[in-house]
């Protein structure tokens, strides 16, 4: 079992109804945690928290409703297995969505958002995503790290056609819960070129509704060849890195989907960034 399968969280967005009426489920999504024990952030897509399209800002619900809170299904340990621990997180202070509790980029087209949740509920399995990018040194067993020269401290490249994975719950189907579905997603556009002048790129993957907000991972298994600088490197260690946040397909008839880079995520949550990280976009 890969422990990262527990790292993608099943989310439901809800509208709070006034006057004693039942609350309305707006839809399923996926999220994940970044941060440190006792100080976590819940990450998903902007449109999951806002209930609006990221391209034009229009409300997505046919009833004209937007989320007031989300329910997150965490995995708790019980009798050698897992039990669901459902936690509600309000998205706003008060009843009328005035003061939002979550962060997002100034440009809503960068479809990511993060909500500070702090410590997890008691008994929950803590499975957060890594916040560092691997280097060649990480391909060697830990006992051999020190003997490697400084040349191996170069970051592993991310290139078009490289294989990535989107971890989530397609169509909101939690039949595999608490383990997420790993959807293979080759890189379909040049990662460094951006997407519409924004910090993202395209994946070629049959992702579906319910996977919005999912973590996108690079996962290299032991023995898989890694090409760096024209050299083919065979290795004994598995390497995993958080590449970004998946936010959905560019069109309902297309299998091309958008992923926003981890740097764009750290721009809104610098508290969870690795030591020495610096923003890539100018700040005032």
Locate predicted features.
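Serine endopeptidase catalytic core focused on the charge-relay Asp
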Residues: 6-8, 27-28, 35, 58, ...
């Amino acid at each position: 079992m890969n422990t990262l399968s527990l790292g993608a969280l099943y989310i439901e967005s809800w509208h709070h109804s006034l006057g004693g009426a039942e609350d309305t489920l707006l839809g399923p999504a996926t999220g994940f945690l970044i941060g440190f024990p006792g100080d976590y952030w819940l990450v998903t897509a902007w449109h999951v928290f806002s209930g609006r399209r990221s391209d034009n800002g229009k409300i997505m619900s046919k009833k004209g409703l937007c989320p007031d809170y989300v329910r997150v299904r965490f995995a708790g340990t019980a009798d050698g297995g897992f039990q669901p621990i459902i936690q509600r997180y309000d998205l706003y202070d008060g009843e009328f969505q005035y003061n939002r509790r979550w962060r997002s980029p100034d440009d809503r087209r960068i479809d990511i958002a993060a909500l500070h949740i702090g410590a997890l509920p008691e008994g929950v399995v803590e499975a957060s995503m890594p916040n560092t990018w691997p280097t060649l040194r990480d391909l060697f067993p830990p006992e051999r790290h020190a003997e490697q020269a400084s040349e191996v401290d170069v970051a592993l490249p991310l290139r078009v056609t490289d294989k990535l994975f989107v971890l989530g719950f397609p169509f909101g189907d939690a039949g595999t819960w608490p383990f997420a579905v790993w959807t293979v997603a080759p890189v379909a556009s040049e990662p460094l070129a951006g997407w519409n002048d924004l910090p993202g790129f395209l994946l070629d993957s049959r992702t579906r509704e319910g996977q919005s907000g999912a973590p996108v991972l690079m996962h290299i298994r032991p023995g898989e060849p890694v090409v760096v600088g024209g050299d083919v490197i065979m290795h004994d260690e598995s390497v995993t890195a958080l590449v970004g946040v998946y936010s959905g397909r560019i069109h309902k008839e297309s299998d091309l989907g958008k992923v926003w880079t981890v740097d764009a995520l750290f721009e809104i949550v610098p508290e969870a960034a690795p030591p020495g990280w610096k923003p890539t976009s100018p700040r005032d």
